[in-house]
């Protein structure tokens, strides 16, 4: 998908959420999508790899939480996987401090690549399990918000 078509599809979907993004932010999403699709060829990150589906089911779905957070919140994304919803939130709200927690180191390497390539700041990755970090005083109660998407049932979280 060319960037012009991508921007058009993103803006159509963003309008429904009353969200406006800059050209730079749209380019970050576009690059993120392309890195995701490329890495997914050699590593199973997601079953959703068609550009229009990535836009709707990964990016837009991740951004639906924006109405519940403030731009200067500190957020931990538990079991982030391919970076959803943490990276989309960070792109939309650049001042937000985000920590991406995942148990698989290969996904952490992917996330580090995305963060570096799309030039995100104040976002870090942590390799580990949520149940271990929940008891670590360096991380416990250091975030305004903890988010998770398709990690475990709510009673487990």
Regions found by a protein language model. Give the residues of each.
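Class I SAM-dependent transferase core
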Residues: 1-2, 6-72, 76, 109, ...
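Conserved SAM-binding loop of SAM-dependent methyltransferases across substrates and taxa
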Residues: 82-95
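S-adenosylmethionine
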Residues: 95-99, 103-157
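Conserved beta-strand/loop positions that form the S-adenosyl-L-methionine
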Residues: 78-80
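Ubiquitous "structural anchor" signal
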Residues: 52, 70, 91-94, 156
């Amino acid at each position: 998908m060319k960037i012009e078509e991508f921007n058009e599809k993103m803006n159509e979907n963003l309008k429904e959420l009353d969200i406006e993004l800059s050209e730079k932010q749209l380019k970050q999403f576009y690059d993120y999508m392309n890195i995701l699709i490329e890495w997914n060829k050699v590593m199973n990150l997601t079953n959703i790899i068609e550009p229009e589906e990535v836009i709707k089911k990964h990016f837009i779905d991740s951004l639906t939480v924006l109405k519940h957070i403030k731009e200067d919140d500190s957020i931990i994304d538990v079991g982030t996987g391919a970076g959803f919803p943490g990276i989309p939130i960070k792109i939309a709200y650049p001042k937000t401090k985000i920590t991406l927690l995942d148990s698989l180191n290969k996904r952490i390497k992917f996330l580090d690549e995305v963060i570096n390539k799309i030039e995100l700041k104040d976002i870090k990755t942590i390799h580990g399990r949520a149940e271990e970090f929940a008891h670590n005083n360096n991380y416990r109660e250091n975030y305004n918000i903890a988010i998770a998407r398709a990690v475990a049932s709510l009673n487990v979280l």
